[in-house]
């Protein structure tokens, strides 16, 4: 990954059709996005088995759903969501809401082995049902 610098106020983009996820940077197991909501947009309640996330509210206000609770998401709020924690977002307070998401993907030995095998199998030539 190369050095990255950006001004969120200059790169933010909004769409009323769908949520805007703008990739900021992407490393091997670490990446960042700018999530731009318009009023009414929702990220449904969900969880990630192998992903830790940090959310920083940069602009506007919305509702953060975490482990069955609701909390206001306003500028300055920083939320750490460890792997396995249920969370979601609801843009119900401001016309526009901007949240920076920083993600760290945990890669365990067993999962890494499966990923390597899957990648290797994709590269092997196949004749019928057998590998050459």
Residue ranges and their predicted role:
Residues 83-110:
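Ligand-binding loop in jelly-roll beta-barrel domains
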Residues 1-30, 44, 114-132:
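A short, N-terminal "cap"/entry segment at the start of jelly-roll beta-barrel domains
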Residues 34-36, 56, 91:
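Conserved hydrophobic "DFG−1" position in protein kinase catalytic cores
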Residues 33-48:
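Conserved short histidine dyad/triad with adjacent acidic residue
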Residues 69-83:
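Short acidic-glycine-tyrosine-enriched beta hairpin
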Residues 50-52, 57-62:
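Glycine- and acidic-residue-biased ligand/ion/polar-headgroup-sensing regions
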């Amino acid at each position: 990954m190369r050095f990255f610098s950006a001004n969120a106020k200059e790169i933010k983009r909004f769409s009323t059709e769908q949520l805007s996820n703008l990739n900021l940077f992407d490393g091997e197991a670490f990446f960042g996005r700018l999530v731009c909501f318009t009023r009414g947009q929702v990220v449904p309640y969900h969880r990630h088995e192998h992903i830790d996330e940090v959310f920083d509210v940069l602009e506007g206000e919305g509702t953060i759903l975490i482990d069955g609770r609701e909390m206001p998401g306003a500028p300055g709020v920083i939320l750490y969501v460890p792997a396995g924690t249920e969370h979601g977002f609801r843009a119900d307070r401001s016309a526009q809401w901007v949240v920076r998401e920083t993600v760290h993907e945990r890669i365990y030995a067993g999962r890494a082995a499966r990923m390597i095998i899957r990648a290797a199998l994709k590269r092997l030539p196949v004749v019928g049902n057998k590998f050459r």
